[in-house]
Amino acid sequence: MALQGWRFFGVSATIIIYIGGVLFLSMNNIPGSHPKRPRIERFAEFPSFHSPRFPMPSRKMTIRWCRDLKYINRDLPIYADYKSDFYTALPSDVSAALQSLPALTALASFPGSGNTWLRYLLQQATGILTGSIYKDYGLLKTGFPAENVCNSSVLLVKTHEWGSKAWAPFSKAILLVRDPEKAIIAEFNRQSGGHIGFASPDRYKRTKGKYWQQFVSNKLKGWEMMNLSWARNFTGSIKVVFYDDLVHHTERELRSILDFLQFPINEQLMRCAIMRKEGIFRRKKRLLSFDPYTESMRAEVQNRRRIVYGLLGRQEP
């Protein structure tokens, strides 16, 4: 009898525990019965990280071209790898085709001088693709499908190189020159944040500022060598364009460049190019809360600029 009583008690306890558990779970699942768990934001320290105003790098940027872009001559085989293919013996029919095309023109500049922006303007004003001795995948996907094309099927070819081997493919050149103080910062931004991004303030202060100081010293020498070697030693026709003139007198400079290239001006395309001149490849201004140049650095930059500008026939203001 006692055994049956214990069995009855055990079964009853099990049923009570089961019913209690069901009621507890039901109450916790009723909407509004408990506060919502706060949402954890990724990259919360960057409130605009996912904002449409600041597109993710992987998002494809689209450009409204004034006209569909094309090659000057689609029938010409594209020998795209400059370093490995340009100096090899080409088939006779390709060599003949190259010789029958207009002279190959370089768009030479020190990095950070506005080369990409000028290419963008010229593609808008002509509808013709521009090439490059490099293969920048970022540019390849965002408006420059002829990256790494280095022959006269394109309007001109971008280069940041100098010296006899760099000059060899070209019979004409446009030398784009920018104030070294601004060009060096633009190149520092490009290496840190891409073609339209910026370097964080912390990058200027790496290794207690020694990294930035060495960067300026190296790039200033490169800026001087790049501009003077092309201006003095290139044996073909050369036109010097100053970035500041391109910014303040865009249409005048574009017309002058197209005249140098002996490319007919389409007035409708020119108006369209000027209307869309900003594009996405001209880095917007950003004011730093500090001056990255020390007094001695700025004095050296200004001295080199004065010497180079004087040799290029540019009068300092």
Swiss-Prot record:
GO terms for cellular component: membrane. It is found in: Membrane. Gene3D superfamilies: P-loop containing nucleotide triphosphate hydrolases. Glycans are attached at residues 151, 227, 233. It is a single-pass membrane protein. Keywords: Glycoprotein, Membrane, Transmembrane, Transmembrane helix. Changing residue 214 to L: In strain: ZBMEL186. InterPro entries: P-loop_NTPase (IPR027417), Sialate-O-sulfotransferase (IPR051589). The chain crosses the membrane at residues 8-28. Belongs to the WSCD family. This is WSCD family member CG9164. It comes from Drosophila melanogaster. The lineage of its organism: Eukaryota, Metazoa, Ecdysozoa, Arthropoda, Hexapoda.
